[in-house]
Amino acid sequence: MPHHDGSELYVSDAAPKIGDKVVLRVRVPKSYTFAKSFVRLYHDGEPRSFELTLEKSGATESWWAVKVKIENLSTQYRFVFVDVDKYEWLNAAGFHDHDVHSNNDFQIVAIPAYPDWIRSSVFYQVFPDRFAKSSTKRPIPEWAQARQWNELPTVGSKVTGTELFGGDLTGVEEHLDYVTDLGVNGIYFTPFFPARSNHRYDASSFTEVDPVLGGDKAMFKLVTAAKKRKIRLLGDLTSNHCGAGHPWLAKAQRNKKSKEREYFYWDKSVKHGYVGWWGLASLPKLNFHSKALRKEMYEGKNSIVKQWLSPKYGMAGWRIDVGNMTGRLGADDMHDEVMHGIRKAMDQVKPDAWLVAENGDFIASDLNGFGWHGAMNYQGFMRPVWNWINLNTTIGGGFQGLPFSMPKINGKQLVESMKSFNGSIPWRSLVASMVLLDSHDTARMRTVVLGDKKLHLTAMTLLLTYPGVPSIFAGDEIGLEGSSGEDSRRTMNWEDQSSWDLAFLSEVKELISIRKKHDALINGGLRWVLVEDDCLAFLRESKKETILVFISRGAVNTKIDVSKLGYIVKKSLYGVLGDGSIISVNTDKPTQGLWVLESSQKLSG
């Protein structure tokens, strides 16, 4: 079927200015017949159509193009192919033989380009208390329960959030060589602010590093050491709430006329007297009706958002916790104002900073180009991947918005889910979003697949070849397990590596290296070429190269004739070997393969 996506092969300028002209291209297989084709786009809310013309043609395909003028900040468009007795639409969700809503139309946003460095980044998520413990003795706060390093975390108990294992930022610094050797070039930290919990999402200050982690001094040393290794650091900010131990709340409770009083929502019907996130007294909800709060958080010259992006503190960007709920409570909806305000503040002090938000569900309304650069792509990536390879029927679906255990789907359902969710956002937002297999809030992938190493490798291969910014939760690369978010926050056993899956670690290193070296995986589009129940294959195509990716979740016997796609195999890159024009995969277990392809046809026009 005809193909178009937002990558460089199909869109001449992904970040145009209003008034610029952009060339849109469609690749059409010779087997597909039509009389005429048009692009339909919206100018000032009104649909307009422009006919495509033949640009070039080869043995297996032809390329059709149209030049359009960008009239609005956001331009939605789709293509239609007309024949004698039919018409068919092509939008970001796929091909349709009937009229469909414009929610999944392709989109071009006329704003400056997103930070270029994120495309070639692979991030490593670190939960500071559980990654590495230095020899420096740190204070144990009164709220904490000290634990031995290699104990398992307690799950579902009152002490779960107060167990401290002793990981700190100095420990991270001491293991940066490991991080570098793994191949990642970014570290995403869950919060490092002072708090009354091990997860630190209940900040008692946003302007300093928790002394339990080594304080500001440890952070400065870590930033310097990371910079030498060309590793960027991503902070984690809770703009939705603070902790009950924050001085803002104490001042607000003492003085009803204080400016801090406006920072919160008040509720006399609950014992603690204020609205907490999900009713939790430990997490007072922030009220952005307060101009003073906005100044503190992001608008002011020395605001929290800006402080940590300064050269002194060295963060490369922010991950916004529960970004979808920030600025929202009942009838109050200041979400877009706050989101845009945070983005504006970041652009003022560090234009190349990355802004990515947590959003466990529908992300389209937040990723229109003007707020978050991207989101943690749970619904458009992690959830369909889990559903496709899940062997563990005991894992609940609550975190992913399901009132039942994770279901089982086939390959077609996986691809259609991905197209549905990812097709609702601009391509530039998709590639700026974080793709992940798990996190500190979920079960770990090794547990999802019931310890099946080959199946885990299938998931990891998909993670490191799919559009977006891959994020690996520390420990996944050595096969750490965990049946829930709380259980997944296990420590890294640095002293005894006999429990490490070293063979899997080697595979992950190789895949990360491939991801960072190959332009097709950095700048390429996404074209599905094989979709079966148990196996999938797709092309990542850029101006410089083409890579074919194959994965299976079990036994398969299939062939991919790349000559029908206009290619031949140039070299095998990873996993299954292949050459010539036909790649054969006959296996009784989960399998992976990557091949560099080269064109077998001459395009003329």
Where does each model-flagged region fall?
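Extracellular recognition modules
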Residues: R78-V82
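Short amphipathic
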Residues: W64-K67
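Exposed beta-strand face motif in extracellular beta-rich ectodomains
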Residues: L73-Y77
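Short, solvent-exposed loop/linker segments at beta-strand-coil boundaries, enriched for Pro/Gly
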Residues: G45-P47
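Active-site and adjacent substrate-binding regions of carbohydrate-active enzymes
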Residues: P2-A14, I18-V22, V26, K36-F38, ...
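Conserved aromatic beta-strand anchor motif in extracellular beta-sandwich/beta-rich domains
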Residues: V39-H43
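Short glycine/proline-centered coil/turn motifs in the loop regions
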Residues: P29-S31
